[in-house]
A protein has these predicted regions:
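Short active-site segment of divalent metal-dependent hydrolases/proteases
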Residues: 77-85
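Generic recognition of long tandem-repeat/solenoid scaffolds
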Residues: 3-4, 56-58, 65, 100-102
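Short helix/loop segments within enzyme catalytic domains
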Residues: 124-133
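Post-HEXXH active-site segment of zinc metalloproteases
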Residues: 70, 74, 86-118
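Short, conserved alpha-helix that lines the donor NDP-sugar binding/gating region
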Residues: 121
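A generic secondary-structure boundary signal that marks alpha-helix termini
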Residues: 85-86, 129
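Auxiliary, metal-adjacent structural segments of Zn-dependent hydrolase domains
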Residues: 1-52
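Active-site scaffold of zinc-dependent metalloenzymes
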Residues: 36-70, 86-87
Length: 133
């Protein structure tokens, strides 16, 4: 998290976590953390990448608590890994986020097999011990 955006409350623990994960996974683009306003089902976060900047939208309850738990660590590893995938051009979404292109192969929202999600889940376990605060 290179720059600060005022979201109405302080998240110093999460800021430290994002910085640490970014270093551990080799993520070099700026990342903003923003409240997730439109939550669907059990969605706790999602990532976007545009104009060389990653934005991770996180469930507001998690941000307000600013508490680092194993779940929160894995959530941020997962979402920051998606930022890395997008910054490297391996994962690209169309403007409406209805079609994803993963390493040259197109997938729609109807596809249940999403290799970028499988990879991000693996990274949660791979990097958890290195990131644990």
């Amino acid at each position: 998290m290179k720059e600060k955006i005022n979201i109405g409350y302080k998240i110093p623990n999460i800021e430290k976590l994002v910085d640490k994960i970014s270093k551990v996974i080799g993520l070099i683009v700026p990342v903003y953390v923003m409240p997730l306003k439109l939550k669907r089902l059990d969605e706790n976060g999602y990532a976007v990448f545009s104009a060389g900047i990653g934005t991770v939208f996180i469930n507001t309850d998690i941000l307000v608590k600013d508490k680092i738990t194993p779940f929160v660590i894995k959530l941020f590893i997962h979402e920051l890994w998606h930022v890395k995938q997008m910054s490297e051009g391996r994962l690209v979404f169309n403007e409406n986020h209805t079609i994803a292109t993963w390493e040259g192969v197109k997938y729609t929202n109807k596809d249940t097999f999403r290799p970028w999600e499988i990879e991000a889940r693996k990274m949660e376990s791979k990097y958890y011990k290195q990131v644990k605060i």
